[in-house]
């Protein structure tokens, strides 16, 4: 279910840190809670259009989510990315006594048309190439649930806690021809920011900063601006904000009361807005334009009343000669540019829109062209109902010739 876009970049919420019931560390209640998990994802706030299905080292949770999607579920989400969360072999410290493992998140560019093959490729050419730790006896023991369980003394959680895959190997793969243009990387901010404590070296912290594309944080909104300010001391990489969800208490979108009514979410939060298409290339735009493409806030960064926004237009050709394709043309709620050569119909399009909306516009030069042609206009607040003649909404229309005349008169 790949989405096509014809309206330019738009602000949408991206939540790129949601663990599944298949994650090694989670509190959903195990794999039997997957139906409830999907229900919760389907009731995410309507502004959330991109999610990252995040699991430690493995892609099984993403694969399970996509099984539901291929059966018609999760139509509320435009794009679902797989994200592998790695613990790296450099430690930060929140205090003198407690070491904190730094998390590296790896998002993969993956299409849905050939899903099985792409998942297989990630398993075989990425995950299975990395040992479970850097010590000699594990050189031939690659990442797998079985190897973590065996080395943990038949205890998966212990193996997961004790063993850290070699970070050098992870970055070696990320920089190889297969993956360097197919991955986007984040560091967990909190643990990374503690690297200078407990005698850790700042050069190592700077090296990690330079290796990744952005940072993730689940910090509370009140402290987020300060965190971004501290991060800016190293460069212009952006924070992305998410709740780091591991259980239903923070994915409480599927809760119901005793009457079966949906209860408003109280704990779920994600404040990351990205202005881009919901694609991998869209995400990469935040590297080059971090200030223009990312906003961390509760409300829509460019909220406008739907009453005042033209959502789409449609030509109606009754001549039987197929002068115009009877297709809907989506319009951006921001700036729209009409591009075309001389006499290609740019002014005609604007005149038709203005005329349909009740503006007195001189279209005598186009009378023959527009014979048996009209245009339908749809507003954002009711995009299924075309505008009628008694609609009171108006626009201000300044034709090109009118502007030229104003300039000449000024001269």
Short names for language-model regions:
Residues 171-196:
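Aromatic-lined carbohydrate-recognition surfaces of secreted/lumenal glycan-active proteins
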Residues 360-374:
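Short beta-strand-centered segment that lines the nucleotide-binding/catalytic pocket of NTP-utilizing
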Residues 51-54, 110, 332-363:
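Phosphate-binding glycine-rich loops of NTP-binding sites
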Residues 289, 350, 355-359, 403, ...:
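Short, well-ordered loop/turn and helix-capping segments at boundaries between secondary-structure elements
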Residues 79-165, 188:
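Alpha-helix N-cap/helix-start capping residues at coil-to-helix junctions, especially the first residue
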Residues 370-411:
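P-loop NTPase motor core
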Residues 278, 308, 330-333, 344-348, ...:
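Generic recognition of stable, solvent-exposed alpha-helical segments in well-folded globular domains
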Residues 1-48, 59-81, 86-115, 189-343:
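Charged catalytic cores and adjacent phosphate/nucleic-acid-binding surfaces used
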